[in-house]
Amino acid sequence: MNRRKALAFALAGFALATLAAAAAPPEPPGYRLDDYQSPTPDTFNGEPALSVEAAKAAWSDPKTIFIDVLPHPPRPEGLPKGTIWQEKPHAGIARSIWLPEVGRGALAPETEAYFSRSLSEITGGDKDAILVFYCKRACWMSWNAAKRAASMGYSQVRWYSDGIEGWREAGLPTETIAPRP
């Protein structure tokens, strides 16, 4: 009887692993244009997404640049004149730079120019700087932003797919960050 249970558990584990592997979609040829909070590929440019351990190792090198691409919530419309509105603090991976909105599938020309200019400024024009893009777990915006940076000629682009949630769960340092102007 114990053999049967062991075999059943082994088969169940194999089935779950197979289903989990099948759940990850392949890398698309272009950008994801909608449904950003959905299953993401396990890879970026054919390379595995950074694990928490790999992201932590990359972060330990102060030359590595972590970039948060989570959108910035706008000021609510229709607030009466003179209303004081205070933004909710945004926690990011410590030492990261927040470039909101740059992970959408289609960017307005102004947003694309902002992204290009920001990358040039934060890397000092070094197209070989190591860039790690993140957002939330299973968020296509960070994948899109990484793809866009690579298309701009940046050669050391990495994608951290577990995002801020994975970082926090690992007990790694975070800090309140503001959007880069």
What label would you give each PLM region?
Residues 2, 9, 19-53, 58-61, ...:
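Rhodanese-like catalytic fold shared by cysteine-dependent sulfurtransferases
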Residues 55, 65-70:
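Short hydrophobic beta-strand that contains or immediately precedes a catalytic carboxylate
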Residues 7-14:
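Sec-dependent N-terminal signal peptides
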Residues 73:
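Glycine-rich nucleotide phosphate-binding loop and flanking beta-alpha elements
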